[in-house]
Swiss-Prot record:
Example GO molecular function: transaldolase activity
Family: Belongs to the transaldolase family. Type 2 subfamily.
Lineage: Bacteria, Bacillati, Actinomycetota, Actinomycetes, Kitasatosporales
EC number: 2.2.1.2
Transferase as UniProt keyword: yes
Protein name listed in UniProt: Transaldolase 1
Cross-referenced InterPro entries: Aldolase_TIM, TAL/FSA, Transaldolase_2, Transaldolase_AS
Location in or out of the cell: Cytoplasm
HAMAP family listed in its UniProt record: Transaldolase_2
The organism's place on the tree of life at top rank: Bacteria
Length: 381
């Protein structure tokens, strides 16, 4: 348990992030974290103003069984299917977390205090099913501060437009490439235009675009290490930051453009960039690298708890480390390409792997819940 005095001493870097316009979200959720008061404590002591979840997070939380036994027993008695059971458990957690964050949501005018829940990853390549699932999740959670996560696959793009057009706030996930990010922003603007035409108040619609960071370095650095030249080794740890910085440049251009300006006149909100996958995988780098080097106004950084703790303990927040660095970012990516590492190939591979990883985690979760339901005498099929 962190005391108030300890929190004051350790949260300095996190407060400096907030001062720079960066919203700190926690990339984790479990029933124990909610019921123990830990989430509320992180809000009080570590500047946490939002929560993101994904299939892997729920697989770890529910798969452990801790805190879910009573609900599992109830669901088994009712004879629900395994898919229904998983949805009831995950939406219950998100609803409870949304209630914990409601004060933040109200105080920020809806900008923060958000909890994200992802559509079934098995639907990543089915537009109509994704839209239907997003609507159902919004209805099931039934909280104004929920965000529905939709993957930025080709099929996900029109789904984003439809869901935003229905007035539902969206967290677009699994973005790796600059080209796809531009398509995501276009889908968001099209959704706002659709909502406006339907007479929906645009002020109530919020969105973030989750741009994945560390996975880009992991894959590109692996290829650079195989090359083994001095130039190649010197570029390790730079591609992901360059990619993210150029994404921020694209964000600035789009949301300063005429199309969004017209929507802003109707009280529309810009879709904020969210830095995801910010836990550092390579021990050769500072464990706060993707926090310190991606400080820019109007962004979100969602962190696993280990990264959050590291940032609070020894984070070095020096102000904006993104804007103005675009020329160097372009040079870094060009250097990687020149060495024969294909950016397009890497980001396409990462998108495919990202969808596959979430689907695999979801299948593991379904298997674990099926086993729990079966052990209580009810068929989970």
């Amino acid at each position: 348990m962190i005391t108030v005095t300890e929190a004051t001493a350790t949260a300095g870097a996190l407060q400096r992030l907030a001062d720079q316009g960066v919203s700190v979200w926690l990339d984790d959720l479990s029933r124990r974290r909610i019921e123990s008061g830990n989430l509320a404590e992180l809000i009080r002591t570590k500047n946490v103003v939002g929560v993101t979840t994904n299939p892997s997070i729920f697989q770890a939380a529910i798969g452990s069984g801790e805190g879910y036994e009573e609900q599992l027993a109830d669901l088994a008695t009712r004879g629900v299917t395994v898919d229904e059971a998983v949805r009831m458990m995950t939406t219950a957690d998100v609803r409870a977390a949304a209630d914990v964050l409601r004060g933040v949501y109200d105080a920020s005018g809806g900008r923060d205090g958000r909890v994200s829940i992802e559509v079934d990853p098995r639907l990543a390549h089915d537009t109509a099913a994704t839209v239907a699932e997003a609507r159902q999740l919004s209805w099931l959670v039934d909280r104004p501060n929920v965000m529905i996560k939709i993957p930025a696959t080709k099929a996900g793009l029109p789904a984003i437009t439809e869901v935003i057009g229905a007035g539902i706030s969206v967290n677009v996930t699994l973005i790796f490439s600059l080209e796809r990010y531009r398509e995501v922003m276009d889908a968001y603007l099209a959704g706002l235009e659709k909502a406006q035409a339907a007479g929906i108040d645009l002020a109530g619609i919020h969105s973030v675009a989750s741009f994945f960071v560390s996975r880009v370095d992991s894959e590109i650095d692996k290829r650079l290490s195989l090359l083994g030249t001095e130039e190649a080794l010197g570029l390790r740890g730079r591609a992901a930051l360059a990619n993210a910085r150029l994404a921020y440049e694209a964000y600035e251009n789009v949301f300063a453009g005429d199309r969004f300006t017209a929507l802003a006149g109707a009280r529309a909100n810009a879709q904020r960039p969210l830095w995801a996958s910010t836990g550092v995988k390579d021990p050769a780098f500072r464990d706060t690298l993707y926090v310190e080097e991606l400080v820019a106004p109007g962004t979100v950084n969602t962190m696993p708890e280990a990264t959050l703790d590291a940032a609070a303990d020894h984070g070095d927040v020096r102000g904006d480390t993104v804007t103005g660095g675009y020329a160097q970012a372009r040079a870094d990516l060009a250097a990687v390409e020149r060495l024969g590492v294909s950016y397009d190939e890497v980001v396409e591979q990462l998108e495919q792997e990202g969808v596959a990883k979430f689907e695999a985690a979801w299948q593991e979760l379904l298997a674990a819940v099926t086993k729990s339901l079966d052990s209580k005498g009810v068929d989970g099929e």
